[in-house]
């Protein structure tokens, strides 16, 4: 990972440790977990959270049970140093009732398969009355929708706008075949970093409005319908990341991206023209790992491995 990526991660996802990160949940639910080194429990059966403790909280993970939501309504605005909050998706319908502190930068929505029936039962309502519509936080720079286990996508039920998220720069979500949420994002002029999961369509024509602003682009778990056609228009890209791409990656397309500093390809199939990477003059970081061809052999042959490893770039890993 080069210095560019490190700065991005630190900006939107600051380090989590037990001194500043808490999970608002019940003691019973906490004890059911095997081990959690990153968070300190904040028992939602408590009737009071001291001002001193509120001041310590920088990252808060909220459970979906017990008194978590009522405690948030009472104490959230006192957590003046809070920069990151993780909310269960089931709380989206009443998120407008929470008194968010001004310093918060990162909003993570955790969607779990146990909410599938809830969103299915409310599909008609949430389609007509979108979640987060006419709501937002001025200082939010990162919006992250995380799907756990077999959770069904909820992006079609969400509506956000530049008016209510004027400083949004980093967005992560699952695309599949839906274009509604992606179309909303195209109205933003501030977005610099996109992470797209489960892409089942030709997504680049829909991303054209980002061609002059997008600096990093990540694709995760995209199947045979995914294509890179159109990526050449994103000439300001500095980092490109692929994880679990099953439709092949032609590295020649990277030659159309002159500012590329970082290329990451992992757990993907049928990587061709890998030698094109040798011509990227601004490359600072290269990570190639666990990529297979049609015969499930390593995509990187001995000749290309030698050439790539001989590149004079600061950070390189070929596995």
Please provide the spans of the model-predicted regions.
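A short, flexible N-terminal coil/short beta segment enriched in small residues
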Residues: 4, 9-13, 97, 207, ...
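Hydrophobic anchor residues at the C-terminal helix/turn of individual leucine-rich repeat
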Residues: 49-51, 76, 98-101, 134-137, ...
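Concave beta-strand-loop units of leucine-rich repeat
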Residues: 22-24, 35-47, 59-71, 81-94, ...
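Generic secondary-structure transition motif, activating predominantly at the C-termini of alpha-helices
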Residues: 13-17, 80, 312
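Cullin-RING E3 adaptor/co-adaptor recruitment helices
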Residues: 1-38, 66
């Amino acid at each position: 990972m080069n210095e560019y990526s490190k700065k991005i991660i630190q900006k939107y996802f600051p380090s989590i440790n037990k001194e500043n990160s808490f999970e608002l949940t019940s003691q019973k639910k906490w004890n059911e977990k095997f081990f959690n080194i990153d968070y300190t429990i904040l028992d939602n059966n408590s009737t009071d959270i001291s001002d001193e403790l509120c001041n310590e909280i920088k990252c808060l993970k909220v459970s979906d049970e017990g008194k978590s939501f009522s405690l948030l309504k009472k104490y959230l605005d006192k957590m003046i140093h809070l920069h990151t909050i993780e909310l269960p998706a089931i709380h989206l319908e009443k998120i407008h009732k929470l008194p968010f502190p001004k310093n918060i930068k990162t909003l993570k929505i955790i969607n779990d398969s146990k909410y599938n029936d809830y969103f299915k039962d409310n599909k008609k309502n949430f389609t007509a009355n979108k979640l987060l519509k006419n709501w937002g936080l001025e200082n939010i720079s990162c919006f992250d929708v995380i799907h756990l286990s077999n959770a069904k996508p909820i992006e079609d039920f969400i509506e956000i706008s530049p008016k209510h998220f004027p400083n949004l720069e980093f967005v992560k979500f699952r695309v599949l075949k839906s274009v509604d949420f992606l179309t909303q994002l195209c109205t933003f002029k501030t977005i610099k970093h996109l992470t797209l999961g489960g892409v089942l369509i030709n997504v680049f024509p829909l991303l054209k409005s980002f061609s002059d602003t997008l600096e990093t682009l990540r694709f995760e778990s995209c199947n045979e319908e995914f294509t890179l056609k159109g990526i050449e228009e994103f000439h300001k890209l500095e980092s490109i990341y692929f994880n679990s791409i099953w439709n092949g990656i032609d590295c020649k397309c990277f030659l159309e991206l002159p500012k590329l500093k970082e290329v990451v390809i992992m757990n993907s199939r049928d990587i061709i023209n890998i030698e094109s990477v040798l011509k990227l003059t601004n490359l600072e970081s290269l990570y190639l790992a666990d990529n297979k061809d049609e015969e499930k052999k390593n995509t990187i042959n001995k000749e290309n491995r030698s050439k790539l490893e001989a590149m004079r770039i600061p950070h390189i890993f070929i596995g």
